[in-house]
Amino acid sequence: SGQMKIAPEHTQDRVLKYMGKPGSKSLVAFKDMFNKLNKAAGKKQFLTYYLIAAHPGCTLEDMKQLKIFTSKELRMHPEQVQIFTPLPSTVSAVMYYTQEDPFTGRTLFVEKDRAKRQQQKDVIVAGKRHGKGRVRR
């Protein structure tokens, strides 16, 4: 299909640490290598990104920074972002329910308000839905 979907899930290093992911420099290095190899092979392939809003430790400001990063560093504007859902037996679920970093015991910001979780997502996708779910007048 000419595309590869990867799951950086976020771009802010602090949030990535809570997700157990490498920092944003790894993502940029991978993207650059992918583009270089495509160009050398004469291919027109591209990356799509799986991103998550409202993960434990993620704030509205982190989502604003994600939007800036994807625009400037990745040169793309995400159309899909998933809102974090805690899954059983995961470290992220422990963080969500305890509101603590299980490795340090420190209090962790966790957005649990449904509207504010949606707001984190909307920072990225607002204006892209063109009225889906709403009546245009």
PLM segments and residue spans:
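C-terminal accessory regions of radical SAM enzymes
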Residues: 61, 77-137
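Conserved AdoMet/S-adenosylmethionine-binding subsite of the radical SAM
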Residues: 1-77, 83
